[in-house]
Structure formats: C-alpha cells, structure tokens
Regions:
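Nucleotide-activated chemistry modules centered on ATP-dependent adenylation/adenylyltransferase
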Residues: 1-447
Length: 447
C-alpha cells in the first residue's frame, strides 16, 4: 500500500508522503513509552526507523478530548466546520462504546447533558491478547443490535482454547537445512485445522447474509420498528472471507502436501454458499500449555530424496499457452534462481485481481467444476491462479514460492508412494526422523 501511495505521490510531483497516526500517549503506559522513544510529534513530521515521515496530531489528547471533539460535531447545525463523517456515524460510534461497556457509557451527544468520556477499548474481533474473555465484545452481543457478532466471539474463543492443542499443528518444518533435512516438530496450524477455520468463517459469512435478508423481510412486513438502527441491520454487517482473500487462501492451501484435491478453499466456499452446508464452531475446553517436542530431523535432500517434485512447473500449461495466451512473450517463466515454472506475473506484493477472483469464485466455479477438481492434485490450482494471472507474486520472491510448492508436492508424492493417510504420514515422519544428529552439521540445521 505504501509503495503504491509513493508511486502516486511521485507521479503528482510530490516529494514524499507523510502517514498521519492516531496514537495517543495516554492510551497506555507501554504506548506512551514507545511513542516517546520514537519522538512522535503532534506539530511536526518525524522520521521513523525506515526513514518514513509520520505525524501524530492526537499525541497529547486525553479520551475526554476525543469525545469532546465528537460531541462538537453531533449537531449538524452547530458544527464548527464541515467534516467528512455524518451525525449518524457519531451516534453509531457512541452506541458501540456504550454497548461495549455494559450499556453504562456516560457519553451524551448534543448540547445538553453530562459528558463523561467512555474508556472502553476496541480492536480486532479475534484478538486473543485481551485474555480468556473479550468482555467488551461479550457486553455488546448481549444487546439485540450487536447480537450478529456472537459467532465472531465464538471463533475467537475457539482460537484461544485450541492454541496449545499440538495435534492441530503441522509437523513438517518450513526450513531446509544445507544438509538436506527438515525439522519434525509441531509448528504452524495443520492443513485440516486451517480448513476447519476457513469453513467456520465461511459459515459465519453465510449466516450473516441470511440474518440480513431475514431482518430486511421483517422490516418490510412491519414485524420490527422502522428505526435507523433496524435499517442499518438490513445490510450485511461483515464479510470475513472475500473472493480475493479466498483466492489467496486457496493458492497457499493448494501447495500443501495434505491438500486432497485442487481448489480446496474454493471448494469449501462452494459447499457453504452453494450446497448450503454449515460448519458450526464447537465449544471446546481450553488446552493447557505443554512443551513442544522436537521429534528430530527428516531427510529430504533437495526435495528429491525419495520422490520427485517439480513444484510450480506446469508442463500442460507450457504446451497450451501458445494457443490460449498467444500474446505472451513466453509460455513459461523462471524464478529468481533460474528454475523453470508456470507463467506468472509480479507486483509489489502478493496480489489478487478482485474482479476476476469474484467472477471465478461466484460465477465460473459451478457444480461441474466442483466435481471435476476432486480428481486433480492440489498443486494444480496454485499453478492455475498464476498462469491465469488472477494472482500475482511479489517481485523478486518467486523462488520462495517455488520452494514452498516443491516441499508440499514432495511430501504429497511421498505419501502417495507409501500409500499413507495424513495421520499415517505424520507417524511415519516421527518414526523415521533422525534422533541422533551428532553426525550432522548442527549449525547448518539451525531453524
């Protein structure tokens, strides 16, 4: 985003951009210390560690100052100067803070009444740093106008409860040592758990669409009062997984060695939004913190020790691209390390064409597609997104994604060769990991 803004600024003839921050010293002791250490200023831009300009106009404001400023704009006729946000936006903001404080927020908008600042704090709905419970969110969902967020709170609680369930973790290490080994140890979330989380979020999205449609019907039928709040609730209030995000998720999941078929994430979307399957978030007891066991090191060579892996190379696309995409300068591409892979294009960051993603996910991917992809290897959809340029890779990072694809394909083919299920493959990795590593170069095997 910053790179794009800088390009636009240069095109306009501007010297550089300055980021306006909403940080306040009074937010917390740690925030204040960090702001002072960075020498943030409210009156002049300062340079951060990356030599970028920023300014913090609210640096010395208190929470009372914030709400006093908002109350000044709560009356359309008495605003001191024009502003971009409406009175309704201020009212909704006040309602949110009141709901997050068990309905006892003392902010009164307008010219009359006691104005006591509300100190409730908000952030990411899935934040687990706040503790075992998100009390502000729990307070909000007790009120009818915010009850739609109950499922989001369930998802957050599920994340927190299962973070130490190591059976939900990946065993295959992400780094390849110079000796040709990967670590076998619980690490990031496993493929099956990532799919579970995706299905839960897709279900929440589908349920929110249904809620909004029913609310709209109830309002039209006169079953609920015609109020600004109820009119707002006729709209979908959130979408956790957009088509663009789904494509990016699918790209990553399809390179996983346990992906059972191509387009795993898009197939999950189809099951929820077209087949109307619902995946409810289970309530689980919190798993206690346990030691993370290193099972040892598993030999893979250059991901060629016991099975072949070509990663993102697509022989079929190389043959067909001259016919399907005759305007391209080549039918394939090369990574930064010179490896031949499927055709791809690059941008400042991993990016997805939002319009084409939406078209493919919501229109092209039908029952025929859903059935056909069950017979295709997972890696094929990663190649598809690249070859069709629906997804572009970060400039200069192509080799990194090739290595990810090769690792996933290697273990997928090893499991196929040994005829092992994912659970059996995990046990095979543990049983065949090198426990005694004295004969290996420990320095080269550092994680």
């Amino acid at each position: 985003m910053r790179a794009a803004l800088e390009r636009d600024a240069t095109a306009r003839g501007d010297r550089e951009i300055c980021t306006v921050l909403g940080n306040r010293i009074a937010e917390s002791a740690s925030r204040g210390v960090a702001m002072l250490a960075r020498a943030e200023s409210a009156i002049a831009p300062t340079r951060d560690a990356n030599d970028a300009l920023s300014i913090s106009p609210l640096r010395d404001w208190s929470v009372d100052d914030i709400w006093l400023m908002l109350t000044m704009f709560a009356d359309e006729e008495k605003r001191p100067f024009p502003c971009a946000f409406s009175v309704r936006s201020i009212e909704r903001l006040s309602d949110l803070y009141r709901a997050g404080n068990d309905g006892m927020c003392g902010v009164v908008l307008g010219e009359s009444g006691q104005r006591t600042a509300c100190g409730s704090r908000f952030g990411c709905v899935f934040c687990c740093v706040v503790g075992d419970r998100d009390k502000s969110l729990e307070s909000m969902i007790r009120e009818p106008e915010h009850a739609y967020m109950a499922g989001l709170n369930d998802f957050r609680n599920y994340l927190l409860a299962t973070q130490w369930d190591l059976k939900r973790r990946e065993l295959v290490g992400r780094s390849l040592s110079s000796a040709g080994y990967v670590r076998v140890q619980p690490d990031v979330l496993s493929f099956s758990e990532r799919m579970n989380l995706l299905r839960y979020l897709l279900t929440l999205d589908a349920l929110e669409i249904e809620r909004a449609e029913q609310h709209d019907a109830d309002l039209a039928a006169g079953l609920i009062p015609d109020t600004p709040e109820n009119r707002d609730l006729c709209d979908v209030q959130f979408e956790m997984i957009t088509p663009s995000q789904l494509v990016a998720i699918d790209f990553m999941l399809s390179m996983h060695h346990y992906a059972p078929h191509a387009f795993p994430a898009v197939s999950a979307w189809f099951e929820v939004h077209r087949l109307r399957r619902r995946y409810r978030i289970p309530k689980v007891d919190t798993f206690p913190k346990v030691p993370i066991v290193n099972h040892g090191w598993f030999r893979v060579g250059q991901f060629d020790a016991d099975a072949p892996a070509e990663g993102l190379r697509d022989f079929g696309a190389e043959q067909w691209n001259r016919y399907r995409h005759p305007g391209r300068v080549s039918t394939y591409a090369q990574t930064t390390a010179g490896e031949r892979v499927v055709y791809f294009e690059q941008s400042d960051h991993l990016d997805v064409d939002a319009e084409r993603a939406c078209e493919f996910v919501t229109c092209s991917f039908d029952y025929e597609w859903y059935a056909r992809v069950q017979a295709n290897a997972g890696i094929e959809s990663a190649r598809f997104w690249l070859n069709e340029t629906i997804l572009t890779l970060p400039t200069g990072k192509s080799q990194r994604y090739q290595e990810m694809a090769a690792r996933g394909q290697y273990f997928a083919r090893l499991a196929e060769r040994l005829n092992l299920t994912p659970a059996e493959m995990d046990q095979y990795l543990i049983s065949n990991a090198v426990k005694e590593v004295q004969q290996l170069d420990l320095f080269s095997m550092a994680a």
